[in-house]
């Protein structure tokens, strides 16, 4: 299944009106053996493999990793978006400030329904914003294989790949903190859609690695110091129950009989008083991931006494990244900057 097909169907099984369209023809070569292009970071930046050997819990894929460009029906901010598919060898790419350095670092999780990665719209373009602010930005190209049970990845027994990659990357950032001029106590996460869910997942699954420790990086804490889930999915009980019915492996989501399905938290996101501070953003007209995902997470965080700031907007839909339009929601990066000052991560 291509990125375009997936996103047109809707990450949560709901028809999508604002997401990536049909796959463009990326090669004039008609041979069946022709290779599709692969994503590479901008000059001067290198993808760093996060596992020294094979990644744990490997999943089958239909072919090699490849990149695709969105069709004309999905040009957020007037530009196409780039997706990366069939990722089996996860990497992270570090973008460091050249001048002023606050010591803050953000690990970025692009969205894509755990089946593809919106690598520019919800990845590298975050770094275009953060690096000039003196913040180190690390884009995680986590595993998405487009096969197997749904979700294709996440903190579920069926396929914990993305959370394993997130835990590993967080440990690597702290291990190399001095080398990369990062304060190890100021490392947060920011993710979109499924990447927003992954932000919440690592913020509630950090006490123990999901994999056998590999080296010194896995002795470092993988708890984020702050989290920024942007239009996140999979966070309400209703969303978790929908997830449980997908794919070939069905499973039961344990919950109280009288639980509010829309506003109760997904049991796979066990919020505690130690969950890091959160900034949440979502739109009322998000037809991909319901606004109740943010509301359910907000309520759970408040009940646990975790500092949380939430912004809800009437319009804006889903998958807009940082691309500015006339809609007020697209000014959200300024709100995050203010919030980072509020929680003491950066100074005025």
Describe the residue ranges of each PLM region.
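N-terminal cap/lid segment of alpha/beta-hydrolase-fold proteins
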Residues: 36-99
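Mobile cap/lid helix-loop segments that gate and shape the active-site cleft of serine hydrolases
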Residues: 68-79, 213-220, 224-270, 276
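Catalytic nucleophile-loop/oxyanion-hole region of alpha/beta-hydrolase
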Residues: 118-119, 123-126, 140-184, 326-330
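Primarily recognizes the serine-hydrolase "nucleophile elbow" in alpha/beta-hydrolase
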Residues: 164, 168-243, 262
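Conserved alpha/beta-hydrolase "acid-adjacent" motif
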Residues: 287-293
């Amino acid at each position: 299944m291509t990125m375009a097909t997936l996103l047109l169907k809707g990450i949560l099984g709901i028809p999508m009106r604002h997401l990536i369209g049909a796959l463009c023809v990326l090669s004039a070569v008609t041979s069946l053996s022709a290779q599709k292009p692969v994503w590479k970071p901008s000059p001067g930046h290198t993808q760093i493999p996060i596992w020294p050997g094979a990644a744990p819990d490997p999943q089958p894929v239909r072919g090699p990793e490849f990149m695709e460009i969105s069709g004309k029906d999905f040009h957020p901010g007037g530009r196409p978006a780039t997706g990366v598919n069939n990722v089996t060898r996860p990497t992270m790419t570090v973008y460091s400030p050249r001048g002023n350095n606050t010591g803050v670092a953000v690990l970025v999780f692009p969205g894509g329904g755990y089946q593809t990665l919106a690598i520019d719209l919800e990845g590298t373009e975050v770094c275009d914003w953060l690096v000039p602010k003196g913040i180190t930005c690390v884009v995680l190209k986590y595993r998405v294989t487009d096969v197997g049970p749904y979700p294709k990845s996440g903190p579920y027994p069926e396929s914990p790949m993305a959370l394993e990659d997130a835990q590993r990357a967080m440990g690597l950032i702290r291990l190399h903190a001095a080398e990369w001029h990062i304060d190890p106590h100021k490392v947060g996460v920011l993710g979109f859609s499924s990447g927003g869910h992954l932000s919440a997942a690592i913020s509630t699954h950090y006490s123990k690695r999901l994999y056998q420790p590999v080296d010194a990086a896995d002795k470092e804490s993988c708890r984020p110091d702050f989290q920024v889930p942007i239009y996140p999915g999979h966070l309400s009980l209703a969303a978790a129950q929908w997830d449980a019915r997908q794919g070939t492996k069905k499973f039961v989501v344990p919950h109280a009989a009288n639980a509010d399905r829309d506003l109760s938290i997904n049991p796979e996101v066990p919020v505690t008083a130690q969950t890091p501070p959160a900034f949440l953003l979502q739109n009322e007209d998000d037809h991909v991931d319901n606004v109740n995902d943010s509301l359910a997470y907000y309520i759970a965080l408040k009940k646990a006494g975790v500092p949380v700031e939430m912004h809800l907007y009437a319009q804006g839909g889903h998958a807009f990244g940082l691309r500015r339009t006339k809609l007020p929601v697209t000014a959200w990066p300024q709100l995050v900057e203010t919030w980072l000052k509020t929680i003491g991560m950066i100074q005025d």
